[in-house]
């Protein structure tokens, strides 16, 4: 499973890179706004340090606008993936951009049929939003399982990005359900490292080490 980080915060991205576990980045207008910096400055900084896929979102709602913005974003780097919303106009844009060799990530997926439509339109990625479904008392992980089954049944190469991740259990369940990628907020990514027994074990090792005579370091 690949780990993307869902952020536009450069410091968070750098830390994830240093941990050696980062495969890519996803952003959106909300995350970009949280930085308080000009959008293009944020994007250029991200692309300067990330080798893997970086999803950048269009903001137009019509096909022409999405295609225009998608082409602009794609020119910023070879690893740019254009995020397109799951709409009829969006699927037209996906078809055009993918035909031009520009990879797309269809976002705001909430049903298996939406994912199937995106795959048929040629999307490189689909992003089912797990947490938002959980928020309305629907099991979001069932969506990932259904998409995985459908894609496997028909040989679609579109990759599944489990999105709207809220806690470590979401990551675990997405991995078990067969998601290709989980895009994870920084706080959840940090939480994946932690376990109380690990902390207890480290503390015991250090205390025992203090008893060792003539330590080399």
Swiss-Prot record:
HAMAP family noted in UniProt: Transaldolase_3b
One Gene Ontology term, aspect cellular component: cytoplasm
Classification via InterPro entries: Aldolase_TIM, TAL/FSA, Transaldolase_3B, Transaldolase_3B/F6P_aldolase, TSA/FSA_arc/bac
Organism: Hydrogenobaculum sp. (strain Y04AAS1)
Pathway entry: Carbohydrate degradation; pentose phosphate pathway; D-glyceraldehyde 3-phosphate and beta-D-fructose 6-phosphate from D-ribose 5-phosphate and D-xylulose 5-phosphate (non-oxidative stage): step 2/3
Enzyme's top EC category: transferase
Catalytic activity, EC: 2.2.1.2
Source species, domain of life: Bacteria
Entry's Gene Ontology molecular function annotations: aldehyde-lyase activity; transaldolase activity
Purpose of the protein: Transaldolase is important for the balance of metabolites in the pentose-phosphate pathway.
Catalytic function, reaction form: D-sedoheptulose 7-phosphate + D-glyceraldehyde 3-phosphate = D-erythrose 4-phosphate + beta-D-fructose 6-phosphate
Family: Belongs to the transaldolase family. Type 3B subfamily.
Name the UniProt record assigns to this protein: Probable transaldolase
Keyword field contains Transferase: yes
Subcellular location: Cytoplasm
